[in-house]
Amino acid sequence: MDVMNAFDSQAEDSPTSLGRSLRRRPLARKKLSEMVEEELEQMIRRHEFGEGEQLPSERELMAFFNVGRPSVREALAALKRKGLVQINNGERARVSRPSADTIISELSGMAKDFLTHPGGIAHFEQLRLFFESSLVRYAAEHATDEQIALLTKALEINSQSLDDNALFIRSDVEFHRVLAEIPGNPIFMAIHVALLDWLIAARPSVPDRELHEHNNVSYQQHIVIVDAIRQRDPDKADRALQTHLNSVSATWHALGKKSQKMR
């Protein structure tokens, strides 16, 4: 038996409510800026404009596509968000290659919104735990002596920042960044940087005095992680990492509840 296409003549005569509903709804028309964006994107992907090459001026694009300046500017802004062009003041747009950072940054708005949903932070914390668990296992098996030396240096900066919360947070992020760099995968780095940015931005504001004990606990847990990596023991490194991140999550949840009660 042939499958009926929703847009053929038989489907149009169908008495179903779905068919009637479809006939009453006109297809949405694309904005001029979207049409310009799509055409320019195809031209870039066909290499009609090479990487580093400048696109025609706004005036030339207006004439070529027979559209106004706002449509051209909206199209170029959309291409910039996709990482396909760079736009500097006073210069024509220049073709660029999307990076891992560009890809992840496209998700930033949605991720930050998701973090405000019930359970959103817990879901992202679980994602971070799964992700960094793989990173430390890889580090224990594959990290070079030079990479372990970088972890050791990050630990030293950690220890020097214990009494300054702002500095400690930066040194904490740097420690985990060094871990994320070990596989040499730029996508891992982009994901890791974004994850930490999103989670840190979602943390509650708490007095500095509340964080001093937490800083010292985190530092001691970092030491255990690095020791396990030095010993080339992926299971031990994984357990140490999970202990650390579960401790961090529990601390911030407790601080968040305490902060809410004080309001």
Curated annotation (Swiss-Prot):
One of its GO terms (biological process) is negative regulation of DNA-templated transcription. It comes from Salmonella typhimurium (strain LT2 / SGSC1412 / ATCC 700720). It comes from the Bacteria. Residues 1-25 are annotated as: Disordered. The keyword Calcium does not apply. This is HTH-type transcriptional repressor NanR. Keywords: DNA-binding, Repressor, Transcription, Transcription regulation. Residues 30-98 form the HTH gntR-type domain. The keyword Lyase does not apply. NCBIfam families: PRK03837.1. PANTHER family: HTH-TYPE TRANSCRIPTIONAL REPRESSOR NANR, TRANSCRIPTIONAL REGULATOR, GNTR FAMILY. GO terms for molecular function: DNA binding; DNA-binding transcription factor activity. CDD domains: WHTH_GntR. Transcriptional repressor that controls expression of the genes required for the catabolism of sialic acids. Residues 58-77 bind DNA. Belongs to the NanR family.
